[in-house]
Amino acid sequence: MEGKTVILGVIIMSLVMAQNQVEAKICCPRTIDRNIYNACRLTGASMTNCANLSGCKIVSGTTCPPGYTHDILQNYGDAVNEYCKLGCASSVCGALTTLKNSMQVNCEGAVSQCTNACSNFCTKGSAKVVETA
C-alpha cells in the first residue's frame, strides 16, 4: 500500500511541475543556449534558475522577443497538447512500466490510469467539454 502512495505522490508532483512548463514559454538567443537550458532542467533546477544560467527568457505570451528566436515550447494548436501528453506519459508513466518490467509487478491498470491522467491534465479537461457540447 505504501508503494502505491509513493507512486501516486510522484505522479501528482510531476503533473504539477509539468503545468509550469506548459503555461510558460522559454525563448533563447541561440540553439546552444536552449540546449544548456534543457540540460539544466534535467537536473531538477527551476525554470528561473535555468533561464538565468543559459541566458534564455521566460515569456507568458506566445511570441519570443527579438533576438530570442530559439523557443522551447512552440504553441501551434494541438502540438502543445501532444507534446505535453507524450512528455507526461514518458516521464511519469514510464516509471510504472519500468517497475512492471523489472519487478514482475502487475500494474497494467495503473499505467492506463496514468496515461489517461496525463491526457486529461494536458488538455485541462477540454475533451470532456467538447463531448458534452
Curated annotation (Swiss-Prot):
Residue pairs linked by disulfide bridges in the UniProt entry = 27-64, 28-56, 40-50
Q: Which UniProt keywords apply?
A: Disulfide bond, Plant defense, Secreted, Signal, Toxin
Any single Pfam family the record assigns to this protein: Thionin
Any one of the GO BP annotations: defense response
Chief place of localization: secreted
Q: Which InterPro entries match?
A: Thionin, Thionin-like_sf
Signal sequence extent: 1-24
Q: Which GO terms describe its cellular component?
A: extracellular region
- Which tissues and organs express this gene's product? Expressed in flowers.
Is Signal set as a keyword in this record?
Answer: yes
Subcellular location, record wording:
Secreted
Query: What role is this protein assigned?
Result: Thionins are small plant proteins which are toxic to animal cells. They seem to exert their toxic effect at the level of the cell membrane. Their precise function is not known.
Q: Name the PANTHER family on file.
A: THIONIN-2.1-RELATED (PTHR33920:SF2)
Q: Name the family.
A: Belongs to the plant thionin (TC 1.C.44) family.
| Protein known as | Thionin
Protein encoded by which gene: THI2
